[in-house]
Amino acid sequence: MSATRSMEPDLRGRKVLLHDMCLRDGMHAKREQIPVEQMVKVAMALDAAGVPLIQVTHGAGLGGNSLQHGFALASNEAYLSAVAPKMKQAKVSVLLIPGLGTMRELQSAYNCGARSVTVATHCTEADTAPQHIAYARKLGMDTVGFLMMAHLNDPEGLAKQGKLMEDYGAQTVYVTDSAGYMLPADVRARVAALRAVLKPETEIGFHGHHNLGMGIANSIAAIEEGASRIDGSVAGLGAGAGNTPLEVFLAVCDRMGIETGVDLFKLMDVAEDVIVPMMDHLVRVDRESLTLGFAGVYSTFLLHAKRAAARFGVPAREILVELGRRKMIGGQEDMIEDTAMSMAKERGLLKDVSRKAA
């Protein structure tokens, strides 16, 4: 046993930047319904705990307010303008998915106080991002390339996509486990492949979901292979079974000697006293969110699938498995109802659907 332990990387003194997602990914779990005042309260509590980077937007990012992705209680500009001036040490970040968010919206976010942007693409589509990344760099923003659903590309393929993002100007490239599908070996292989092709000064990040309960283990695996940025969400507030629970991950970091600069007890208090009371439902690994991780389905699909299940009479778990089989990706939310309708039709349930609609 001692020989095995001696082979484990010593992470003492390793510096890692924590990036909280509860005010962006957490919007999915709240059906985008977080009031501006509550957004400010949470952000100020995170700032006081020492969290250095906090993401604040609609769940789908800039341009996310739409029929397909849901309408938030306020615009991204309203959220950012309220939160950014209140920050004493934390920087505010935003999510931008090319094709949804625009450069004009990025400029507006910058004007409202955002200083970091996560430019997110599917793991095989980095070539949709060069203009957005270049514009973010022109603005002087901390610019991150974010490769979503990373399990759908092998390590070598993901490394090529990450290299493209670096060439476009990204200062950090993320391995993004949008489905909570990956195991530590999967994460290690992809982070190592990126580290082998990126410049030494280009950082690597990891964004996990807790659908298989692997968020913390996967994040540590990423750090072992050279990642220096880790996303998480206080109390795990996020899509599916939530993101890597940030306060739990921080406790593990403190145990391992990983340096984050964040106060553990303050973050624990934020989770218990601020985030848990605002949850509409307990964010946990349940039957449907576990199915997301097992089948490799985009975590944001969870509540959409539950709504489709109620409408068409097909169990949400079975809808999610079919979405995984079809390899549906982020941005294809409109296909969830189509899939459920097709399944209902095959099972002779459409008469019941019309009766429910009436």
From Swiss-Prot:
<feature type="binding site">
    <location>
        <position position="207"/>
    </location>
    <ligand>
        <name>substrate</name>
    </ligand>
</feature>
<dbReference type="InterPro" id="IPR000891">
    <property type="entry name" value="PYR_CT"/>
</dbReference>
<keyword id="KW-0058">Aromatic hydrocarbons catabolism</keyword>
<feature type="binding site">
    <location>
        <position position="209"/>
    </location>
    <ligand>
        <name>Mn(2+)</name>
    </ligand>
</feature>
<feature type="binding site">
    <location>
        <begin position="24"/>
        <end position="25"/>
    </location>
    <ligand>
        <name>substrate</name>
    </ligand>
</feature>
<feature type="site" description="Transition state stabilizer">
    <location>
        <position position="24"/>
    </location>
</feature>
<keyword id="KW-0464">Manganese</keyword>
<keyword id="KW-0456">Lyase</keyword>
<comment type="similarity">
    <text>Belongs to the 4-hydroxy-2-oxovalerate aldolase family.</text>
</comment>
<dbReference type="InterPro" id="IPR017629">
    <property type="entry name" value="4OH_2_O-val_aldolase"/>
</dbReference>
<dbReference type="Pfam" id="PF07836">
    <property type="entry name" value="DmpG_comm"/>
</dbReference>
<dbReference type="GO" id="GO:0003852">
    <property type="term" value="F:2-isopropylmalate synthase activity"/>
</dbReference>
<feature type="domain" description="Pyruvate carboxyltransferase">
    <location>
        <begin position="16"/>
        <end position="268"/>
    </location>
</feature>
<feature type="binding site">
    <location>
        <position position="298"/>
    </location>
    <ligand>
        <name>substrate</name>
    </ligand>
</feature>
<feature type="active site" description="Proton acceptor">
    <location>
        <position position="28"/>
    </location>
</feature>
<dbReference type="InterPro" id="IPR012425">
    <property type="entry name" value="DmpG_comm"/>
</dbReference>
<dbReference type="InterPro" id="IPR035685">
    <property type="entry name" value="DRE_TIM_HOA"/>
</dbReference>
<feature type="binding site">
    <location>
        <position position="178"/>
    </location>
    <ligand>
        <name>substrate</name>
    </ligand>
</feature>
<keyword id="KW-0479">Metal-binding</keyword>
<dbReference type="GO" id="GO:0009056">
    <property type="term" value="P:catabolic process"/>
</dbReference>
<dbReference type="InterPro" id="IPR013785">
    <property type="entry name" value="Aldolase_TIM"/>
</dbReference>
<protein>
    <recommendedName>
        <fullName>4-hydroxy-2-oxovalerate aldolase 2</fullName>
        <ecNumber>4.1.3.39</ecNumber>
    </recommendedName>
</protein>
<feature type="binding site">
    <location>
        <position position="25"/>
    </location>
    <ligand>
        <name>Mn(2+)</name>
    </ligand>
</feature>
<feature type="binding site">
    <location>
        <position position="207"/>
    </location>
    <ligand>
        <name>Mn(2+)</name>
    </ligand>
</feature>
<dbReference type="Pfam" id="PF00682">
    <property type="entry name" value="HMGL-like"/>
</dbReference>
<dbReference type="InterPro" id="IPR050073">
    <property type="entry name" value="2-IPM_HCS-like"/>
</dbReference>
<dbReference type="GO" id="GO:0030145">
    <property type="term" value="F:manganese ion binding"/>
</dbReference>
<dbReference type="GO" id="GO:0008701">
    <property type="term" value="F:4-hydroxy-2-oxovalerate aldolase activity"/>
</dbReference>
<dbReference type="GO" id="GO:0009098">
    <property type="term" value="P:L-leucine biosynthetic process"/>
</dbReference>
